[in-house]
């Protein structure tokens, strides 16, 4: 169970750090979030209207703030519940991580699978963590 808790914590930690980096970047450094630079060329970014750029930035801020908040909540559930053998924590994590990773693939499909390797890696990490945690509980 502890191995699963650690692996899920790594998953959450990666999401937390990436979410914070992108959030700080969008708020303080660059007018275009990372996803814009993945999807659009520099020439295409230059042609975006301020309204379009503002909308993309707004969504990136909300999305990355949600990533950070979700990661913190996952860490709390892992170390308050799962690490102490609470079955509810495993079921909560199963539902939450499954939903989040499924939505990652849906979002990735919307941009032409440009972030597919990262989506696959994070999904595998979540699955491994859940399997080890489940084996430790049952």
Features from the language model and the residues they span:
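N-terminal signal-anchor transmembrane alpha helix
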Residues: 3-35
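Juxtamembrane helix-break-helix junctions at the cytosolic face
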Residues: 71-90
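A loop-to-helix transmembrane entry motif
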Residues: 32-35, 51-69
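Core segments of transmembrane alpha-helices
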Residues: 15, 66-75
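Membrane-helix boundary connector in multi-pass membrane proteins
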Residues: 101-120, 138
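Aromatic-anchored segments of alpha-helical transmembrane domains
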Residues: 97-105, 128-130
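Membrane-interface helix-boundary signature
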Residues: 1-8, 49-59, 86-90, 111, ...
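Membrane-water interface at the C-terminal end of transmembrane alpha helices
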Residues: 126-138
């Amino acid at each position: 169970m502890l191995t699963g808790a650690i692996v899920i914590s790594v998953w959450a930690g990666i999401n937390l750090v990436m979410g914070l980096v992108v959030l700080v970047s969008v708020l303080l450094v660059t007018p275009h979030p990372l996803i814009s630079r993945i999807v659009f060329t520099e020439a295409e970014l230059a042609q975006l209207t301020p309204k379009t750029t503002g909308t993309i930035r707004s969504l990136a801020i909300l999305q990355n703030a949600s990533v950070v908040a979700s990661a913190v909540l996952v860490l709390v559930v892992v170390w308050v519940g799962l690490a102490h053998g609470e079955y509810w924590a495993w079921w909560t994590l199963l539902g939450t991580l499954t939903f989040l990773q499924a939505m990652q693939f849906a979002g990735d499909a919307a941009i032409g699978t440009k972030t597919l390797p990262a989506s696959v890696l994070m999904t595998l990490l979540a699955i491994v963590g859940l399997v080890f945690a489940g084996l430790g509980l049952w």
